[in-house]
Design a protein with these regions (language model features):
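Structural marker of alpha-solenoid helical repeat scaffolds
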Residues: 74, 108, 139-142
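Terminal, low-structured helical/coil segments at or just beyond the last alpha-helical repeat
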Residues: 22-35, 47, 133-162
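Register position in tetratricopeptide repeats
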Residues: 50, 91, 125-126, 156-160
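Residue-level recognition of tetratricopeptide repeat
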Residues: 78, 112, 144-147
Length: 162
């Protein structure tokens, strides 16, 4: 009987705590779920890319971009959305547009690690190594993986693009 009582109390507390942690006004909003869906598509596309299924990956990147556009319409001050918009357009080969998204994101958050890394990668891909090194300089003191990844990409002149 004592075990059943403890079990019931535990279940009640865990349910109560889970309910207390959820808020209908938090990330359950449509724009957050659209953004989250886009991020999932980007990750799936990346896995396909690693398997050399490039056409399928590009289709997923394009699909993710469409979702990101919708998310951006309702949250224009989110640098993460702009980062992924730049990433997806870069992955389908639209470097000019990707650069615009990255630069727009940096206007909002100049020290955004992801944007600085990906913009640096774009600069390597478009043979603008000096500009890539500028992005690396911004990341120098971040103590982050983005610094190491961009540094490797610059050293290998893009043969290690992620």
């Amino acid at each position: 009987m004592k075990k059943i009582t403890i079990l019931l109390i535990s279940l009640f507390l865990s349910t109560t705590l889970m309910a207390a942690g959820s808020d209908s006004s938090s990330s359950d909003t449509p724009k957050a779920s659209i953004y989250d869906d886009a991020v999932k598509l980007v990750k799936r596309a990346g896995k396909l890319e690693k398997k050399q299924k490039l056409d399928k990956a590009k289709k997923l990147y394009a699909k993710a971009f469409s979702k990101l556009e919708k998310a951006y319409k309702s949250d224009k001050k989110n640098p993460d959305i702009l980062n992924y918009m730049g990433f997806t357009t870069r992955k389908v080969g639209n470097f000019d547009q990707a650069e615009k998204f990255y630069l727009e994101g940096l206007k909002i958050k100049p020290n955004h690690n992801g944007i600085n890394e990906y913009l640096g990668e774009l600069y390597v891909q478009t043979d603008r190594i000096d500009k890539a090194k500028e992005r690396l300089e911004v990341l120098k003191n971040c103590n982050c993986e983005e610094y190491g990844e961009l540094e490797l990409i610059i050293k290998t002149r893009g043969s290690k693009v992620y």
